[in-house]
Amino acid sequence: MTDNTDNDKLYRYLFQDRAVRGEWVRLNQTFTDTLNTHQYPKVIQNLLGEMMVATSLLTATLKFEGDITVQVQGDGPLKLALVNGNHQQQIRALARLQADVSDDMSLAQLVGKGVLVITIAPTEGERYQGVIALDKPTITACLEDYFVRSEQLQTQLIIRAGEFEGQPVAAGMLLQIMPDGSGSPEDFEHLATLAATVKEEELFGLTAEELLYRLYHEERVEIFPSQPISFFCGCSQERSGAALLLISDEELDEVLAEHNGTIDMQCECCGTHYFFNKAAIMQLKVEK
């Protein structure tokens, strides 16, 4: 049986004798909550799981308050897959399909001609956006390439998503040479070689301490306190109402007439419904 102690947590760790840092994350209930309101095919579920883990690992590298959005855009059956996470490890995800998919489809078959877009948005300061070609077989490989190109740091990403003991789970590890230039490529390669031996069931079933001991029992590893991860959408009646105000009065009247006087707005991420009748819309306009 899995030890649930480290479910939905992120750990950072350092190697005391080598200038290399690491992160480990596992999503259990967070992943389940994301999938609960959608009937995504298994291949899309797993892709979102990989992207959620990657987003969690990416946000943990931020040195400021803000959020990161990781999205896949393409002209294939998968039109969009999007994950957003912030420095508090609150995360949400959604996918949009424009054709049927099968679970044996590769990333290239799902996306067609597509790109991976990473947007970093500090609470204060300028946004940064990077666009990466989806020219590798997995999202993980594309993101690993992004790290190397954007930060010019040796980086290893190991991410898995699927089921363990009958429940959805996604987990992963990030290994990165320290940005201060004190680390050696040889040290990084040594640790990366050890990390590459990790098994899926170990990522899904062991605690962080057990896993790191299994991989690095001859190393001195300092593990920092964990950070909890949770599904958080952020939608609200107010935000939905603000979106309605962007529509012309004529269009609103048409939609109201077509839907028996009530507009039902459903959040794509969490599935919550927000209802607006004519009186509610008029009140929104007054408050504006």
Curated annotation (Swiss-Prot):
Instruction: Report disulfide bridges, numbered on this chain.
Output: C233-C235, C267-C270
Q: Name one GO biological process term.
A: protein refolding
InterPro entries with a match to the protein in the record: Heat_shock_Hsp33, Heat_shock_Hsp33_C, Heat_shock_Hsp33_N, Hsp33_helix_hairpin_bin_dom_sf
Alphabetically sorted, this entry's keywords are: Chaperone, Cytoplasm, Disulfide bond, Redox-active center, Zinc
Q: How is the protein modified post-translationally, according to the record?
A: Under oxidizing conditions two disulfide bonds are formed involving the reactive cysteines. Under reducing conditions zinc is bound to the reactive cysteines and the protein is inactive.
Where, subcellularly, is it found?
Cytoplasm
Per UniProt, what is one GO molecular function of this protein? unfolded protein binding
- CDD domains listed in its UniProt record: Hsp33
> Please, which domain of life does this record's source organism belong to?
Bacteria
Predominant place of localization: cytoplasm
One Gene Ontology cellular component term attached to this UniProt record is: cytoplasm
- Function statement: Redox regulated molecular chaperone. Protects both thermally unfolding and oxidatively damaged proteins from irreversible aggregation. Plays an important role in the bacterial defense system toward oxidative stress.
What family does the entry list?
Belongs to the HSP33 family.
Name the PANTHER family on file.
Answer: 33 KDA CHAPERONIN
Q: What is this protein called?
A: 33 kDa chaperonin
- State the organism of origin: Pasteurella multocida (strain Pm70)
Q: What is the lineage of its organism?
A: Bacteria, Pseudomonadati, Pseudomonadota, Gammaproteobacteria, Pasteurellales
